[in-house]
A protein has these predicted regions:
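Conserved acidic carboxylate
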Residues: 8
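Two-component/phosphorelay signaling modules centered on CheY-like receiver
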Residues: 11-29
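Acidic, metal-coordinating helix/loop segments flanking the phosphotransfer/catalytic sites
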Residues: 30-48
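Acidic catalytic/metal-coordinating carboxylates
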Residues: 33, 59-62
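Active-site residues of response regulator receiver
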Residues: 52
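The feature encodes the CheY-like receiver
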Residues: 56
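Short amphipathic alpha-helix used as the core "switch/output" element in two-component signaling
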Residues: 61-72
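Hydrophobic/aromatic residues positioned on beta-strands within the core alpha/beta folds
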Residues: 78-80
Length: 116
């Protein structure tokens, strides 16, 4: 079973992702802020995190730094504000980077999760 945390300050987008990925092999939690994500991460170990970069109470890096300390965890940053510095930072921490406007979003997410 894959335990996934989706973090996005746009609840509709977070729920859309959760519904796309929900299935018998996925347990999905959502958080709508950096603070809420950190609280959930204190209570549960996530194998995967899909994180928005820009949120009212912080940036994706605030969450990535916690996840990067777990060698078994993977993360992907989804952003609607493409930026080369953000992309480089994500790769530096060993994550994946994807723009929300990518027309092949579902296939990219499946590749990230290791699903065929």
């Amino acid at each position: 079973m894959k335990i996934i945390l989706i973090v996005d300050d746009q609840p509709d987008f977070a729920e859309l992702l959760a519904n796309l990925l929900r299935g018998e092999d996925n347990e999905i939690d959502t958080a709508y802020s950096v603070r809420e994500a950190k609280q959930k991460m204190d209570l549960k170990k996530y194998g995967y995190a899909i994180i928005d970069w820009s949120m009212p109470d912080g940036i994706g890096l605030d969450i990535i730094e916690d996840i990067a300390g777990d060698p078994g965890a993977k993360f992907m940053v989804l952003t609607g504000s493409p930026n080369r510095i953000i992309e480089d930072t994500v790769y530096l921490y060993g994550g994946e980077y994807l723009q929300k406007t990518d027309c092949d979003l579902l296939n990219e997410l499946k590749l990230f999760l290791g699903d065929p």
